Amino acid sequence: MGQNDIMSTAEDFADQFLRVTKQYLPHVARLCLISTFLEDGIRMWFQWSEQRDYIDGTWNCGYFLASIFVFINLFGQLSGCILVLSRNFVQYACFGLFGIIALQTIAYSILWDLKFLMRNLALGGGLLLLLAESRSEGKSMFAGVPTMRESSPKQYMQLGGRVLLVLMFMTLLHFDMNFFYILQNIVGTALIILVAIGFKTKLAALTLVIWLFGINIYFNAFWTIPAYKPMHDFLKYDFFQTMSVIGGLLLVVALGPGGVSMDEKKKEW
C-alpha cells in the first residue's frame, strides 16, 4: 500500500467518523472545552478559604479583595459554562471566560511561566473557535443573504484559534535523545503545522485528539494520587486544561478550518 493509499484511507476514516458523530460531536467538543473552567469553578467553591488565603498572601490585598477575586472566579466560570452548554449568550460567555483567563494569568503569575502561559493561550484559542462557532450559528438565521464581508472576522477567528491551539503541543515536546521522544516530536510537529496552516485539517486535528487524549490519560492520571497530596491537584489542573484543548481540536474537526486555510484555497484552485 503506497503513501497516497494510506492517506486516502485515513481521510476516508476521518470523513466516516465525522458523518457518524456530526450530530453530537459539537456538543462533546463544547463540554470538553469548558471542562477546565467547570472544574476550577467547583474547586473555588470547595477550596474557598485556601484560594482566598493564597491570593491575600501573594498580593497582600486583604481578605475582602481576595474573597472578591475568588467569587469572580467561581461565578464567572460556572455561569460561563452554563451559558455555553445551554447555547445562550455564548458570545458573552466567551468574553467572560477570556476575562477569567487574563485575570488568572496575572493573579497566579502565570505570565512569567512560559509553559503555563502557552497552555493558557491554547485555552484562549479554543474559546476563539467557540466564539467563531457561535457567530456562525447567529448568521445561519439569515441564510441566503450575502455575508462575504461579515464572515471575514469569523474566518480569522478560526485561524487565530488554530494557531493558538498548537501552543499546547509545544509544551509537550521533549528534547531528550530518545528514539520514542524524537519520533513523537517529529510526528507531533508535523501535525501541529498541518492544523495551523489548515491543510488536511480534519484528519490532522483528529489524530492530535487521539494522541493528546492518550498522553493525558497516561501522564495526568490524578485519580491514582490521594486527594490530600499536592500532586493530585496539579495533575487534575493539567488533565482538565488538556481536555479543554482537546475540545478546541474537536471543534476544528466538526466545523473545519475556515476560509483562511490551505484546504479552502485548494477548492479555489
Swiss-Prot record:
The chain crosses the membrane at residues 64-84, 92-112, 157-177, 179-199, 203-223, 242-262. A motif (Di-lysine motif) lies at residues 266-269. Keywords: Endoplasmic reticulum, Golgi apparatus, Membrane, Protein transport, Transmembrane, Transmembrane helix, Transport. GO terms for molecular function: cargo receptor activity. It is a multi-pass membrane protein. GO terms for biological process: endoplasmic reticulum to Golgi vesicle-mediated transport; Golgi organization; lipid homeostasis; lipoprotein transport; regulation of lipid transport. The keyword Membrane applies. GO terms for cellular component: endoplasmic reticulum; endoplasmic reticulum membrane; endoplasmic reticulum-Golgi intermediate compartment; endoplasmic reticulum-Golgi intermediate compartment membrane; Golgi membrane. It is found in: Endoplasmic reticulum membrane; Endoplasmic reticulum-Golgi intermediate compartment membrane; Golgi apparatus membrane. InterPro entries: Surf1/Surf4 (IPR045214), Surf4 (IPR002995). Its main location: endoplasmic reticulum. The di-lysine motif confers endoplasmic reticulum localization for type I membrane proteins. Endoplasmic reticulum cargo receptor that mediates the export of lipoproteins by recruiting cargos into COPII vesicles to facilitate their secretion. Acts as a cargo receptor for lipoproteins bearing both APOB and APOA1, thereby regulating lipoprotein delivery and the maintenance of lipid homeostasis. Belongs to the SURF4 family. This is Surfeit locus protein 4. The gene is SURF4.
